[in-house]
């Protein structure tokens, strides 16, 4: 994060300790005048938390000018990256599935601010910004989206299967809800190894009715696994509104015997506070559910215009009233931590960096055709298989 600190010039002359690396994108934006102060201040969340069989955390969230400026930068970078991905897809440089996250940036950024790299994160197929929040490289992201060798999954994963093992980011998963049991498995490993870490296990409201979620939740509660199940409720499972798919859309109560919180997922400070609270709960008591009330601006995927099952007025209303980036912009301006022009300059620098990352990604070669056969089997594993006739077949895989 030392690179992130360089981004912002001190306004008040306060000597600041470096912010931990876990909460920042690897950007090098430098904007004069934006406050880098670490003087603490308290801001109240936009709305109260709703809770299920647990006392909610306080609405007052401790933050600093530096943190707010970093939030603004990181969310703006994510937004610009997703808009760029939209253009690359329409130019046919990105093929196949592509699910964009713009509008939901506060969830990824707020969650990262409450965790360390020892904590694990696993999510579904809308995973670009979760990867970036874990410190993922912009050029590696775009290279992966374009199927290039320099991608974070060597060009073989594409949009839905980003991965960053050194940051404990276990990727996106294309099957709805399939990642939830895997996340509980990560938490099982953390408990088995006696690690002081938790797993944030993300899924959408469209996956909230999947059977494997309840099976995994039961086992997690039974064994008191250190897992935080995060339902990113953007209110539409593909094109189906939540009220058409769920008898009870209060997803934070779905755990029955598992505590839950409903959080304004468009308020990055509320997300940070809730995730910090949930992490401590998971370490001490086992699983907890966080329902993030959020919203995606794009359609479900690139083939979905996003306007056949909801009105354009609805989308515009959310942008105007709840946009996560604009909320932080208003806080920075209201507390005189930055001027309008300084924030615009930061956004211009971000756009340049995204463009530079795309140009670098385009220079990366396509994977060699032989890559089709790598990482499929383990070499020399001495597989033993049994047929119905009980005869043993031994073989060595290529």
Curated annotation (Swiss-Prot):
Main localization category: mitochondrion
Q: What residues bind pyruvate, as annotated?
A: 99, 125-126, 174, 176, 205-207, 234, 236
> Which InterPro entries has this protein been placed in?
DH_E1, PDH_E1_Alpha_Subunit, Pyrv_DH_E1_asu_subgrp-y, THDP-binding
SUPFAM superfamilies this protein is in?
Answer: Thiamin diphosphate-binding fold (THDP-binding)
Q: Name one GO molecular function term.
A: metal ion binding
Query: Where on this chain does Mg(2+) bind?
Result: 205, 234, 236
- Compartments in which it is found: Mitochondrion matrix
Q: What class of enzyme is it?
A: oxidoreductase
Q: Name one GO biological process term.
A: pyruvate decarboxylation to acetyl-CoA
Q: Which cofactor does it need?
A: thiamine diphosphate; Mg(2+)
What would be one Gene Ontology cellular-component term for the protein?
mitochondrial matrix
Known EC number(s)? 1.2.4.1
Reactions catalysed: N(6)-[(R)-lipoyl]-L-lysyl-[protein] + pyruvate + H(+) = N(6)-[(R)-S(8)-acetyldihydrolipoyl]-L-lysyl-[protein] + CO2
Keywords on record:
Magnesium, Metal-binding, Mitochondrion, Oxidoreductase, Phosphoprotein, Pyruvate, Thiamine pyrophosphate, Transit peptide
State the superkingdom. Eukaryota
Report residues binding thiamine diphosphate: 125-126, 174, 176, 205-207, 234, 300
Which Pfam family is one of those matched by this entry? E1_dh
In the database record, which residues form the transit peptide?
1-33
Q: Subunit arrangement? A: Tetramer of 2 alpha and 2 beta subunits.
Q: What does this protein do?
A: The pyruvate dehydrogenase complex catalyzes the overall conversion of pyruvate to acetyl-CoA and CO(2). It contains multiple copies of three enzymatic components: pyruvate dehydrogenase (E1), dihydrolipoamide acetyltransferase (E2) and lipoamide dehydrogenase (E3).
The name of this protein is Pyruvate dehydrogenase E1 component subunit alpha-2, mitochondrial
